[in-house]
C-alpha cells in the first residue's frame, strides 16, 4: 500500500497489526472464559520470557497436571483453520517458555500438557471454538 507523498510502500501486514492484536486479545478472553466454564483454574495469562510466550497456564479440573494453552484466533478461514498457525517452530517457542515458567515457579517435576484453543470469530459477535487437548508434545 503506497503512502501519500513519499513514494514508499507499506506492507499490508504492518497496517493490520493493531487489528491482529485486537483479534488475539479477543480470542484469549474467549478462551479464558471457555476454560473457566469447563472448570479449569487459570494460573497465569500472557507469561513472557526470553524464549517465547504462554497465552494461558491453567490447571485442569480434577487433575494435578498443568496445562499450557496456546490460543489461535482468526476472523476467517482464508489462511486455513487457526490451529495450523501452531507450527513446529511455534511449538518449540511455547515449550521453551513452559520450561522457564516451570523453573520460575519451582514446579520442575510437574506433569504438563500442551493444548491449543482455535477460535474463529464470526459475524454478529459469534464465534466457534475448538479445544484440542494434548495438541503437541514438548518440543526441543
Curated annotation (Swiss-Prot):
Record-given protein name: UPF0102 protein Ppro_1186
CDD domains, alphabetized: PoNe_Nuclease
Residue segments, region Disordered: 1-27
Record field: compositional bias (Polar residues): 10-25
Record-stated family: Belongs to the UPF0102 family.
Organism the protein comes from: Pelobacter propionicus (strain DSM 2379 / NBRC 103807 / OttBd1)
Domain of life according to the entry: Bacteria
Matching Pfam families: UPF0102
NCBIfam families reported for this sequence: PRK12497.1-3, PRK12497.3-3, PRK14675.1, YraN family protein
One function term, GO molecular function aspect: nucleic acid binding
